[in-house]
Regions:
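A short, structured surface patch at a secondary-structure boundary
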Residues: 1-33, 133-136, 235-236, 240-287
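Short acidic active-site motifs
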Residues: 14-18, 36-37, 69, 145-149, ...
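Short secondary-structure boundary segments
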Residues: 31-32, 53, 108, 140-142, ...
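A ligand-binding cleft/hinge motif common to bilobed small-molecule-binding domains
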Residues: 33-43, 152, 157-177, 287-297
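Extracytoplasmic ligand-binding site segments that recognize negatively charged/polar headgroups
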Residues: 36, 49-66, 99-123, 240, ...
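Structured C-terminal subdomain patch of bacterial secreted/periplasmic proteins
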Residues: 59-78, 82, 89-92, 160-226, ...
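Basic- and aromatic-lined ligand-binding clefts that recognize polyanionic substrates
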Residues: 76-131, 232-256, 319, 323-335
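His/Asp/Glu-enriched short active-site or ligand-binding loop at hydrolase and phosphoryl-transfer sites
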Residues: 118-143, 184-187, 261-266
Length: 335
């Protein structure tokens, strides 16, 4: 886990002494890394691989491949790039019949020190465009933007991080924007856009779902009838708890957003599961008749799935009301 990795400071202010104490074979650095830090590493005989900001997604793919080669993980890097490209294809397919893209404004900074956004020559502009957004700042270069022009162009959507949402929506003159008045201010983890890497493709998917909800599966309308083996269950509402009977199922539930990313799998006996009384059990192998009877007596539905089957993913999306994410995961699995 990332939390267990030793911290050596920030990207622009690294603790070189601590870094050297870890005896790295290679240091990956962005352009924020100071020349002095590079010199200290060079003097200590530690090679540094600079990762420059790329202009488009193709450049990001190349960067990931380069890192994979540098750390002898070419196969993993290739898999990562393939998954990113598949997600980009997924968005392109879902937006194929869109006639007109909504106008959008990406908030980098706002307020008394000026307005900042992603101009047409920035990497973020490419992400907004790939997600089916018409960036109102695409006709300017760099990051600085005019408040007057923002008000004049009055975008349909405003995209920002959750930290800035309340302040932006309650500060004049932004309160006059149609997006603020109509509730089309959308939040996203802006690191997914600003920091180049595998999550850029996830940002495109998430933004596309915000800007074009009509192109993606809608929320589940309960009740949902689900057939599992010879049994049919009537799911009245979104299950509030779930037990995954295997690590493979657990990982799939993570993928579609049912289980949190930092959760860890724990194998439990049928008796312990029954005592905990989850709303539903998801399994990829049949329980014995005796075990199944215990779940039936406790009124706990057991849904049998094939973790590698894309139709199974769609079904789980319906059960847990995460249809859009399940649709994406199913597309990637089928690719």
């Amino acid at each position: 886990a990332v939390s267990e990795v030793e911290s050596v400071g920030s990207i622009s202010n690294a603790d070189i002494e601590k870094l050297l104490s870890l005896e790295p074979d290679l240091v990956l650095a962005s352009t924020h890394f100071s020349d002095d830090a590079v010199k200290q590493l060079d003097d200590a005989g530690v090679p540094v691989l600079y990762l420059y900001d790329e202009g488009d997604m193709e450049g990001v793919y190349d960067m990931i491949s380069l890192v994979g080669e540098a750390v002898n993980c070419e196969e993993a890097a290739e898999k990562t790039v393939d998954e990113m490209q598949t997600k980009m294809d997924y968005v392109s397919d879902r937006l194929a019949n869109v006639d007109e893209n909504p106008t959008v404004y990406y908030v980098v900074g706002y307020g008394e020190y000026g307005d900042y956004t992603a101009g047409g020559d920035t990497f973020v502009n490419g992400i907004l465009t790939a997600a089916g957004g018409d960036n109102i700042a695409s006709d300017v270069e760099g990051w600085s933007y005019s408040t007057e022009t923002l008000l004049e162009k009055d975008p349909q959507y405003v995209i920002l991080n959750a930290y800035n949402e309340e302040g932006f929506c309650t500060t004049d003159p932004y309160t006059e924007l149609s997006a603020v008045k109509n509730g089309f201010v959308e939040t996203i983890d802006t690191n997914m856009l600003d920091r180049q890497g595998p999550r850029n493709a996830d940002a495109v998917v998430e933004l596309a779902q915000m800007l074009h909800p009509e192109c993606f599966p809608s929320e589940t309308e309960y009740p949902v009838n689900v057939k599992s083996g010879v049994v049919e269950y009537n799911i009245e509402s979104c299950p509030e708890s779930v037990y995954a009977a295997s690590e493979e199922v657990f990982d799939l539930l993570k993928e579609i957003g049912v289980v949190s990313e930092d959760a860890e799998y724990e194998q439990k006996s049928v008796e312990d599961v029954v005592l905990e009384a989850p709303a539903v059990v998801v399994a990829d192998a049949e329980y014995s008749a005796e075990e199944k009877a215990k779940f039936d007596d406790a009124n706990i539905p057991v849904i049998y799935v094939d973790a590698e089957d894309d139709e199974t993913v769609i079904t789980l999306g319906q059960i847990f009301n995460c249809n859009a994410k399940a649709d994406e995961v199913a597309y990637v699995k089928a690719a």
